[in-house]
Amino acid sequence: MKNMAQKPNSIVHVEFHSNAPDKTKSFLKDVFGWKFEDVPEMNYSMFNPPSAPGGGLQRAENMPAGVLDYILSEDIENTLRKITSNGGAVVMPKQEIPGMGWFAVFQDPTGITLALYETSPQPRPARATPKKAAKRTARKAKKSSKRSR
């Protein structure tokens, strides 16, 4: 889910669930020239086609083979409330993707299964340490003393 500068409510990730992920990966490489990056700790492979959205490939366990589209949400809990109040159903509640964000899976009233994705807040840049701030103050003082001579 890299490079997700899309706006909320956009499709930002496509996930393929395959009964034979190695065969699917070979097929997509051979036909479309896609490159995959394996994420062994998640039993997952990421891909980035020539244009967005990118996606992932995983073994279809406890689910049929197919495609799951992820929609960017600013607030998954609020979006899930809207989904249920409009006749949809939560299939999988909000869960963390360590280091990336959160996701949840839902169905619309007709049975279409989709997912939500919420990014982790980006850490703020570190403020200057006291040592750096002291050096900066010393440089400014030195410059001003040169000017006053």
Segments predicted by a language model, with ranges:
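Short beta-strand micro-motifs in enzyme catalytic cores
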Residues: V12, N43-S45, V67-D69, M100-A104
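Conserved short beta-strand elements that form part of the metal-binding/catalytic scaffold
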Residues: G33-G66, T113-E118
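Residue-level hotspots at or immediately adjacent to binding/recognition sites across diverse folds
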Residues: H13, P21-T24, F32, N48, ...
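Tryptophan-centric aromatic hotspots in well-structured domains and transmembrane helices
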Residues: H13-V14, F27, F32-D38, W102, ...
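Short glycine/proline-centered loop/turn elements that form peptide/ligand docking sites
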Residues: P40-Y44, E96, P123-R124
